């Protein structure tokens, strides 16, 4: 978009813990629209877990990015933006960024996946109630709205009287690539092995190897498919607390010839695997948020 066509009437600041690959396309689109009037504030370094998952970006810092944790000067700049901006979107970041602007009744959006992933029990009820009031309830008379990055977000907050009639659908917005469907399908393993004695299909799973994403379900599926005589190649991409368990499952079930675990890799490399896969498995339960990896695989 040409500079003269940009809407210069609105200054928007997006505040979160760090800039990841699933937020980057949205930020670039905002820069294309607003130019210098859009900024992303990172409040902490990217975690080691996310770096191991391949979340590191191509650039150390983008022109629109302010890493508030790196110096007092940048911290003050971030705090000033949080007050002065016409609109602030805040995710995983301290409320101290938005309290001054809410006192001035300035438009603010929080974004969140569902807060009650672990449910409500007698031993966590007091903590949940206090947290809801501290981070959400006390602001409800102000112009603050919720961007819900999960189908359950609005309902969870509404149970505590928060954001009723003030929720909007939201998510993570990975890059949407344009493909030639015919050319894309030619790259699939099923197409490459078509006509062979044993045509093969590729099956892909990608994400953090943690309990509620249930990567072990993929291994059990592979075991069933192999017993039934199907020819396939399954790939599980990612790292996490279940990694050793999954390697053991593959060995115990004698699946080394049809299941591989290459570990973590950059988002661009994962996308390459998606382009070649015939089938993508998404095994998460209701604890999943928006499902950015699912978005990418559907693209």
Residue ranges: model-predicted function:
Residues 116-142, 185-188:
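Nucleotide-sugar donor phosphate/pyrophosphate-binding loop at the beta->alpha transition
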Residues 63, 245-265:
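Nucleotide-activated donor-binding/catalytic signature segment of Leloir-type glycosyltransferases, i.e.
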Residues 13, 185-186, 193-213, 219-222:
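Conserved donor-binding/catalytic core segment of Leloir-type glycosyltransferases
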Residues 271, 294-299:
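Short alpha-helical segment that forms part of, or immediately flanks, the ligand-binding pocket
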């Amino acid at each position: 978009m040409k500079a003269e066509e940009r809407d210069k009437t609105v200054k928007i600041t997006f505040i979160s813990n760090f800039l990841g690959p699933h937020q980057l396309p949205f930020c670039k689109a905002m820069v294309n629209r607003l130019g210098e009037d859009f900024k992303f504030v990172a409040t902490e370094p990217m975690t080691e877990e996310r770096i191991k998952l391949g979340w590191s970006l191509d650039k150390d810092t983008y022109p629109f990015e302010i890493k508030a944790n790196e110096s007092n000067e940048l911290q003050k700049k971030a705090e000033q933006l949080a007050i002065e901006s016409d609109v602030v979107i805040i995710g995983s970041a301290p409320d101290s960024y938005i309290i001054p602007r809410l006192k001035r009744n300035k438009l603010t959006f929080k974004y969140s996946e569902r807060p009650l992933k672990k449910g409500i029990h007698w031993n966590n009820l007091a903590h949940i109630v206090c947290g809801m009031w501290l981070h959400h309830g006390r602001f409800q008379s102000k112009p603050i709205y919720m961007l819900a990055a999960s189908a359950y977000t609005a309902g969870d907050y509404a149970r505590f009287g928060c954001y009723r009639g003030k929720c909007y659908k939201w998510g993570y917005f990975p890059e949407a690539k344009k493909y030639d469907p015919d050319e894309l399908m030619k790259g699939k393993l099923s197409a490459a092995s078509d006509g062979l004695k044993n045509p093969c299909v590729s099956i892909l799973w990608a994400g953090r190897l943690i309990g509620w994403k249930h990567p072990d379900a993929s291994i059990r599926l592979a075991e069933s498919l192999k017993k039934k005589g199907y020819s396939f190649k399954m790939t599980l991409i990612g790292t996490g607390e279940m990694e050793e368990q999954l390697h053991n499952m593959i060995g115990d079930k004698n699946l080394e010839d049809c299941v591989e675990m290459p570990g973590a890799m950059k988002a661009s490399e994962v996308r390459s695997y998606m382009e070649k896969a015939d089938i993508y498995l998404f095994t998460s339960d209701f604890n999943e948020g928006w499902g950015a990896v699912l978005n990418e695989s559907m693209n």
